Amino acid sequence: MLFLKLVASVLALMTIVPAQAGLIGKRSVFKPKVMIINMFSLEANAWLSQMDDLYANNITVVGLNRLYPQVHCNTQQTICQMTTGEGKSNAASSIMALTLSPKFDLTETFFLISGIAGINPYAASLGSVGVARFAVDIDLINSVDLRELPSYFQSSGWEIDTDPYENGSSNEIVYPESMPYQTNLYELNNTLITAAMEIIKDVVLEDNEKAASYRKLYNESAARRPPFITQCDTATGDNYWAGTYMGDFVSNITNVLTNSTGHYCTTQQEDNASLTALTRASFDGLVNINRVVIMRSGSDFDRGAGNITALANLLNSTGHVSSLACDNLYHAGAPLIDHIVNHWSYWT
């Protein structure tokens, strides 16, 4: 009986090992032209279900999120996809694990960070896609509960290494004397962003009745538009926030840190962390930080409309259109990926 079990185990291994050996035999090191980075399963499925052949190669990488332990690549190994897990910690650790993996050569790879986000109704509408030039970390602040601050304070937070009394009773956010964390602000390659926008600017995005109906509650002209693609900037914070006061605070931080060249429109939980990992990898020549594009699609508004309170807006699933937002990430990103892969000399 023991002998039969041993034979069965050996036969089982014989069926598994050749498949693994075949995969490595094709190419011991994967060198994709594009790496798609998603944060959770709904975003990933929009790509894996619509882009052909991404399950052709499934590469387990040490250090990835246990929920998403594999990188998926097409047959030609030109396009790959990974999922980091949500939040800064997951994003930074997963991307660092990828860049350090000996299974990949990412020195010439373009990275497309593709995820859903809260959206500023003054900048865009549900289902719209924002392509960011700046990523601002809104967690790196001093903060005191408003109930324990003087009444003239406009928000409960202000930039670290600044004096909240510098402008007297106005309590305006001011530019910090230094940025000791070095991750407060990232500016992406504007030449790349401009080229990407030129390719995707006329893409027609999907819409649905749910999104259209909810948009009508808002007075802002951008919020009432059908989904569209725009160049605007993104704010990173682990807190899932909502409300006009928080929205104004995030807009103010973006304006100050970018010297009024940035325009906040999307809020999410990962991008500064992802860029930190990619930047460190770039320092050592493992990736090229100038080859990163961030696309974020609005799944919900960052503040309520009319009499809808911030709390109601945050908890109200009626105004959330995550599936539409994920589909539009694919519709906006796929033409760019196609152009990069099929016109490689243009991009390099």
Swiss-Prot record:
Localization of this protein: Endoplasmic reticulum
Main location: endoplasmic reticulum
Keyword Endoplasmic reticulum: yes
GO process terms (BP): nucleoside metabolic process
Pfam families on file: NUP (PF06516)
Family affiliation: Belongs to the NUP family.
Function: Probable nucleoside permease that transports adenosine and guanosine.
Name of protein: Probable purine nucleoside permease C285.05
Organism name: Schizosaccharomyces pombe (strain 972 / ATCC 24843)
Lineage of source species: Eukaryota, Fungi, Dikarya, Ascomycota, Taphrinomycotina
